């Protein structure tokens, strides 16, 4: 997905704490496997990411705040060249889209916070290492991303990658914020191919698609190409539960799914891309 080169970016929309150091305890998960696997493992043990993070103290943070965004992310041209600037542009586009959706219902969008970090970060849900990958903390209503996850998406999960694949990940996490505002984030936690946890994640995929299908109308982006859509669908499939289980365990167990299969994730991303309203993403009452 290509940004209009002349569009203005607001780097202040994203908090950049890369280069800070987090001291003390908190969640420290090894392996650099990304939040999808972490969530799957936690759910298998009877909890979820919020339960684990929420039970840990927030760790103090030291060091200077990164200034790269302020200095170098000024326009859509920068977003087309730099990964962090692309994140800024994607968030601004998502803000416009979801503001309009809420306004159409007479509501005002409460925008999520967005923080870029490296190595570790302190949140209201506790502290986490970069191994957790992208995640949303409902307690501070903030999306946290270590940009290194996008490299993991290609090298560890086997995705093709690409700008729209990266923005799919960001818009999925933004979708969790929308679910939180609508009271849907905790609608279901049971695992399995048709369980509540899977339905929650598929809805976030669908919300990502709703934005993607209408993103050009936000004024930040050029129309999607077939290649860009294919990259996002490839990323969605790469992080399907069946693909991850096959890669990690050598076998597939649908009863343990928490995010949906490759096919399910692609299907609901497509439903969003081709849809026009929140009703098109009602995974809790649909045959998934």
Ranges and model annotations:
Residues 40, 98, 145, 168-181, ...:
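Active-site recognition of the HExxH zinc-binding catalytic motif
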Residues 1-72:
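Long amphipathic alpha-helical segments used for membrane anchoring, targeting, substrate engagement
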Residues 2-17, 194-223:
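Post-HExxH zinc-binding segment in Zn-dependent metallohydrolases
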